[in-house]
Regions:
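Ligand-binding pockets and gating/stacking loops
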Residues: 1-464
Length: 464
């Protein structure tokens, strides 16, 4: 949620004597319907003073359930049939860089992509925690739990623009609990993401309520909260206050609401990404297959959001009969359905970011919680495989057009340049200008905690 002031405020006063801290304070007052003696021209001048380079941002796309790395980005055509499967690799526009034949659009923009084929340290069970915060859920955690990446960014950086939250989640709630993103951990509710999906989107517009009425309601709420604040020792009230201020800011601004409204987008761009039904949860317990979420994510970072997370479809293809009683549930049938849509929407995001001049400012990572077994099962599926995983990255002034790492002849083990989840997140923090070697956040007991696990450093092949 919106964190107006934090320990990492940068810079001092602007040339007109208005400090950045004052600018942020003014934004809060404006969102609450009170200006503290500041005139409207001064408010507008103060907001204009925050202009400059577009804020850096990250989009994190979670492929729910664990995608099959050896059928997507690490094909082994010379392996036995029971390992290689039916897919064949195709050349990309980068010499020596091959991917699945079902991804012709991605092949055409591979010079803008990086595939990491050697992610290690995965767990064997479904748990989205590691995807969202880079932490091994099997290891001890501090009181309150580890915060996810966007929560940490919210705490350290706050909002990039006065009326935009630092962190938005476009993740759909899955009925299978382990597929869902974790909470804010020990950083608390004040830094939880804005979750605009479903009925809550109606809260992003005024619906006829005037700013004066909003200000009156806010005054009453703050008066009633005084007593509760005096006796509250859990920190939840601070989170509530921050959430309320966030909501007030959004209610008085259309920027985020407009970003979520695809009717305002060029229909040709919407068509390029494709659309899906958000009410259809894949296999009943996964996320919906909604390519338009990637477009909404682009619109949100363009509106000033620092971190956008989203979950996409379901990739846990064990074969056999699925939870909906679907008999023809072969992994290769599912891939034939899923891969073309994935190719279309991800390549659309790649090209869209470049065409709109956002590619250097927005880094994207696409991954799941683990890989899949090299050997195809008797019921024509691939099971969980924690030994190795893969990720697709693009954007963010990184050196793309490359493959990092390698696996053995059956895509079962990393044999070159193993990469950890922590290294990927160190790279994303680096993109945002946050030094993971020097920066910490305090837990509930006041102990400084490092941002990534195992003293991981940014991936040198990308940023070094």
């Amino acid at each position: 949620m919106l964190a107006i002031a934090g320990p990492r405020q940068r810079g001092g006063a602007f040339c007109d004597g208005v400090s950045r801290r004052d600018v942020l304070r003014v934004g809060t007052l404006a969102a609450l319907g009170t200006t503290g003696g500041w005139s409207l021209p001064t408010l507008l001048k103060a907001e204009a003073a925050t202009g400059g380079p577009r804020p850096k941002s990250v989009i994190m796309i979670y492929l729910v359930g664990g995608p099959p790395h050896q059928d997507m980005f690490d094909l082994k055509p010379d392996a036995p049939r029971e390992i290689a499967g039916p897919w064949r690799p195709i050349a990309t526009n980068v010499p020596g860089f091959q991917i699945c034949e079902a991804f012709p659009r991605l092949a055409g923009c591979a010079d803008k992509l990086t595939v990491i084929r050697s992610i290690i340290g995965n767990q064997a069970d479904h748990d989205a925690v590691q995807v969202f915060n880079g932490r091994d859920p099997r290891r001890p955690k501090p009181s309150g739990g580890w915060p996810q990446f966007g929560t940490v960014v919210s705490r350290l950086e706050g909002a990039a623009r006065l009326e935009s939250p630092p962190f938005v989640s476009l993740c759909y709630q899955c009925t299978h609990g382990p597929y869902n993103e974790p909470g804010p951990g020990f950083l608390g509710m004040a830094h939880s993401p804005l979750r605009p999906l479903g009925d809550s989107r109606r809260d992003l517009v005024l619906n006829g309520v005037t700013l004066d009425r909003l200000a009156d309601r806010m005054t009453l709420m703050r008066s009633l909260d005084t007593l509760r604040r005096d006796i509250d020792t859990t920190g939840m009230m601070a989170g509530y206050d921050a959430s309320t201020e966030q909501a007030m800011g959004l209610l008085t601004s259309s920027r985020v609401a407009d970003a979520l409204d695809l009717s305002r987008e060029d229909p040709r761009i919407v068509e390029r990404y494709g659309t899906g039904d958000p009410k259809v949860m894949i296999d009943s317990n996964g996320a919906p297959r909604v390519p338009q979420s990637l477009l909404v994510a682009r619109r949100l970072v363009e509106a000033g959001v620092r971190v956008v997370t989203l979950n996409y479809s379901k990739w846990d293809w064990h074969g056999g009969v699925n939870v909906e009683g679907r008999a023809n549930n072969s992994i290769f049938v599912r891939e034939a359905e899923e891969f073309p849509i994935f190719d279309r929407c991800v390549s659309a995001l790649v090209e869209d970011l470049h065409e709109r001049g956002l590619a250097d400012d927005c880094a994207v990572v696409v991954w799941g919680e683990f890989g899949r077994t090299p050997k195809i099962s008797p019921i024509v599926g691939r099971d969980h495989w924690p030994q190795v995983n893969c990720a697709l990255m693009f954007g963010g002034t990184m050196r793309h057009g490359q493959v990092i790492g390698a696996t053995d002849r059956i895509a079962g083990e990393a044999v070159a340049r193993p990469v950890t989840f922590g290294e990927v997140y160190a790279t994303l923090f680096h993109h945002l200008g946050i030094d993971v070697q020097r920066t910490t956040v305090d837990d509930l007991h006041g102990r400084p905690q490092h941002l990534v696990e195992g003293q991981a450093k940014p991936i040198a092949e990308l940023v070094g």
